[in-house]
Curated annotation (Swiss-Prot):
Domain CHCH per the UniProt entry, residue ranges: 36-77
The UniProt record lists the keyword Disulfide bond: yes
Function: Involved in cytochrome c oxidase assembly or stability.
Keyword Transmembrane helix belongs to the record: no
Encoding gene, per UniProt annotation: COA4
Phylogenetic classification of the source organism: Eukaryota, Fungi, Dikarya, Ascomycota, Saccharomycotina
Membership in a protein family: Belongs to the COA4 family.
Domain topic, free-text comment: The twin Cx9C motifs are involved in the recognition by the mitochondrial MIA40-ERV1 disulfide relay system and the subsequent transfer of disulfide bonds by dithiol/disulfide exchange reactions to the newly imported protein.
Keywords: Disulfide bond, Membrane, Mitochondrion, Mitochondrion inner membrane, Repeat
GO cellular component annotations of the record: cytoplasm; mitochondrial inner membrane; mitochondrial intermembrane space; nucleus
Descriptive protein name: Cytochrome oxidase assembly factor 4
Motif range (Cx9C motif 2): 59-69
Residues spanning the membrane: none
InterPro entries: CHCH, Coa4-like
Length: 96
């Protein structure tokens, strides 16, 4: 039975690493930028999954968790991205 979301080993490992980053008095620029998205743990869990499996298809649960976090924290509006259909996140907002 496969683990999902916040119960995955990747998520648990990412959460532990995030606790260490928060205690760091001089975090690097990358950690600071990712932390500001509000999705540091979800991002790291996805990276850990891909690094171990080498196959994004095996990381659907981590991807779904990251996507949910990204949207919940308003990052689609803050950062311009391009969707599969070629529209940007800013184009999507204009249509609303």
């Amino acid at each position: 039975m496969s683990e999902t979301g916040e119960t995955s080993e990747y998520y648990k490992q990412a959460l532990e690493e995030y606790k260490e980053v928060q205690e760091d008095e001089d975090p690097d620029v990358w950690d600071t930028r990712i932390s500001k998205t509000g999705c540091y743990v979800e991002n790291l869990a996805l990276q850990l999954c891909h690094a171990e499996t080498g196959d994004w298809r095996q990381c659907f649960n981590e991807m779904a968790l990251f996507r949910k976090c990204w949207e919940k924290n308003g990052n689609r509006e803050r950062v311009s991205t391009v969707d599969v259909d070629g529209t940007t996140s800013k184009d999507s907002e204009k249509k609303k």
